Swiss-Prot record:
Pathway: Carbohydrate metabolism; tricarboxylic acid cycle; succinate from succinyl-CoA (ligase route): step 1/1. The gene is sucC. Substrate binds at N264, G321, I322, V323. GO terms for biological process: succinyl-CoA metabolic process; tricarboxylic acid cycle. This is Succinate--CoA ligase [ADP-forming] subunit beta.
Length: 388
């Protein structure tokens, strides 16, 4: 679950981290009043969406008058912002962040993620702030400095100082950076985050460090013990199909293709998408129904997949282990009949009672194509989309 920039900065303030004074506004009038609260300009106005690249898309602007603030708010509030990180529809702009402008001397980067290979929270810092860290990692990886947090000892001040020295900081900046590092690490651990990022972390003309931007991603599996973060959730920024899937404990990710995929198991789902691509198809989604492929869950999965108007065929790939394939077939038949599926459905069953399951599909009288293998399933679903 992602948070907005203004929400991230609210958390920063609770932990004593320096950030510009700002207010999130939902109307042009509120935006003008926010500027009055902040004081003399210039100000910075920012569209609040769960996506990067806002500046290049016109969603961030430095303004010198309240008239400009009103014009910016009137232009963007209620509209959708399209950036390189969104789809063609963009993300809805429901709030504008108005904050004091900062005199920037230098831009840095500071962030942390859970590194699965080392099984540690790893902090990354770079002198190349203000640009995508992925681009820095690809083109100049030597400019990214990393520190792993020991899960028993926790973050240590000396680690912050070590990163500060590698960034070329000196004097009071080392102390300020160490405080920010310790604060971010505390937020990360106490709030069950999966990602935290300040890009850019700037050095002002006065030589002070300020958190100019903030990006936080919470671990969805830990939200049950983070009630205040749950209240910050903005579902308008989420794909409604993904939100609906989460209610049924289905793992769904929307893609740009036209072949809906329903699979049990994340690894098998990725393999299924790969083989669809191999045979010239384009997956419309990733959907893992998990181990309990019951009729109810399969029905809901079909509804979610078919809510995408681009879907021209559906591939169901189920490996029956503990769950018998004949029971899964019953669920698929019931779901297709209930939902009223009007696109070709190709089903590949493998494992426990697979032959009986395939026979039930063949005898159902519904528009269900039983595949003999995964390759056969991929070829048949691609052919169905192409009308062959």
């Amino acid at each position: 679950m992602n948070l907005h920039e203004y929400q991230a900065k609210q958390l920063f303030a609770r932990y004593g981290l320096p950030a510009p004074v700002g207010y999130a506004c939902t109307t042009p009038r509120e935006a003008e009043e926010a500027a009055s609260k902040i004081g003399a300009g210039p100000w910075v106005v920012k569209c609040q969406v769960h996506a990067g690249g806002r500046g290049k898309a016109g969603g961030v602007k430095v303004v010198k008058s309240k008239e400009e603030i009103r014009a910016f708010a009137e232009h963007w509030l209620g509209k959708r912002l399209v950036t390189y990180q969104t789809d063609a529809n963009g993300q809805p702009v429901n709030q504008i962040l108005v904050e004091a402008a900062t005199d920037i001397d230098k831009e840095l980067y500071l962030g942390a993620v859970v590194d699965r290979s080392s099984r540690r929270v790893v902090f990354m810092a770079s002198t190349e702030g203000g640009v995508e860290i992925e681009k820095v990692a690809e083109e100049t990886p030597h400019l990214i400095h990393k520190i792993a947090i020991d899960p028993l000892a926790g973050p240590m001040p000396y680690q912050g100082r070590e990163l500060a020295f590698k960034l070329g900081l000196e004097g009071k900046q080392v102390q300020q950076f160490t405080k920010i590092f310790m604060g971010l690490a505390t937020i990360f651990l106490e709030r069950d985050l999966a990602l935290i990022e300040i890009n850019p972390l700037v050095i002002t003309k006065q030589g002070d460090l300020i958190c100019l931007d903030g990006k936080l991603g919470a671990d969805g599996n830990a939200l049950f013990r983070q009630p205040d973060l749950r209240e910050m959730r903005d579902q308008s920024q989420e794909d409604p199909r993904e939100a609906q899937a989460a209610q049924w404990e289905l793992n769904y990710v929307a893609l740009d293709g036209n072949i809906g995929c329903m699979v049990n198991g994340a690894g098998l789902a990725m393999g299924t998408m790969d083989i669809v691509k191999l045979h010239g198809g384009e997956p419309a989604n990733f959907l893992d129904v998990g181990g309990g492929a019951t009729k109810e869950r399969v029905t809901e999965a079909f509804k979610i997949i078919l809510s995408d108007d681009n879907v021209k065929a559906v591939l169901v790939n189920i490996f029956g282990g503990i769950v018998r394939c004949d029971l899964i077939a019953d669920g698929i038949i019931g779901a297709v009949a209930e939902v009223g599926v009007n696109v070709p459905v190709v089903v590949r069953l493998e494992g426990n009672n697979a032959e009986l399951g395939a026979k039930k599909l063949a005898d159902s009288g519904l528009n269900i194509i039983a595949a003999k293998s995964l390759t056969d399933a991929a070829q048949q679903v691609v052919a169905a989309v192409e009308g062959k």
